[in-house]
From Swiss-Prot:
Superkingdom of the organism of origin: Bacteria
Gene: atpF1
Organism in which the protein naturally occurs: Syntrophotalea carbinolica (strain DSM 2380 / NBRC 103641 / GraBd1) (Pelobacter carbinolicus)
PANTHER family referenced in this protein's UniProt entry, alphabetically: ATP SYNTHASE SUBUNIT B', CHLOROPLASTIC (PTHR33445:SF2)
Subcellular location: Cell inner membrane
Source lineage: Bacteria, Pseudomonadati, Thermodesulfobacteriota, Desulfuromonadia, Desulfuromonadales
Ranges annotated as spanning the membrane: 7-25
Keyword set, alphabetical order: ATP synthesis, Cell inner membrane, Cell membrane, CF(0), Hydrogen ion transport, Ion transport, Membrane, Transmembrane, Transmembrane helix, Transport
Lipid bilayer topology: Single-pass membrane protein
Key word Nuclease present: no
Keyword Cell inner membrane included in the entry's annotation: yes
Official protein name in the record: ATP synthase subunit b 1
């Protein structure tokens, strides 16, 4: 508060006190009829002075208090607007994320289907390759078995042919031919 303002307040307070004292003195006039009007005017004057003094004294603080209150209300409203705007932005972001999530789910589903189809194709290719390998191995194994069976049949045929030839030779060779063949063999081996 400034010095001038303080002096004015003190001056108003003193004037109010004097006027109130004047009203108190004026109200002691006895029961005259015109005293009521005078009393009413003093009271009206007293009220006006009191109201004026209060207005003068309280105008500044009341104005500051109301101004501060108005400022707080304005700040609270601004803060509420900011909070509402922030909430609306978050809501819009959440809505966008939800929309994006639907799109991402659709994309993931499509990717998984494509990956699944690719995986199935790889598995089919591997199965075909394994089947081809098994067929190839079976063919080689069968060829080996057939070759082994041919050799065995050939050996058996040779053995049977030799037995048959031996039996025929035994039937056709006489003991003297046998002695002659042995002698020829010994001569050939001895040389």
């Amino acid at each position: 508060m400034s010095r001038h303002s303080r002096r004015m307040r003190i001056l108003c307070l003193c004037a109010t006190t004097l006027l109130m004292a004047g009203s108190a003195l004026a109200s002691e006039a006895g029961g005259h009829a015109d005293g009521q009007l005078k009393d009413f005017l003093y009271r009206l004057l007293d009220f006006g002075i009191t109201f004026g003094a209060l207005y003068f004294l309280l105008r500044g603080p009341l104005k500051r208090a109301l101004s501060a209150r108005r400022q707080r209300v304005a700040e609270a409203l601004e803060q509420a607007r900011q909070m509402q705007a922030s909430a609306e932005r978050r809501f819009a972001a959440c809505r966008q994320q939800l929309a994006d999530a639907d799109a991402q789910i659709a994309q993931l589903t499509a990717d998984l289907k494509a990956e699944s189809a690719l995986q199935c194709q790889r598995i089919e290719e591997q199965a075909r390759k394994m089947a081809d390998d098994i067929r190839s191995e079976a063919t080689r194994s069968a060829a080996r078995e057939i070759e082994a069976a041919r050799k065995q049949l050939h050996q058996e045929a040779v053995r049977l042919a030799m037995e048959l030839a031996e039996q025929r030779l035994k039937q056709q060779i006489a003991p003297q031919d046998q002695a002659r063949l042995v002698d020829e063999y010994l001569r050939k081996t001895g040389e």
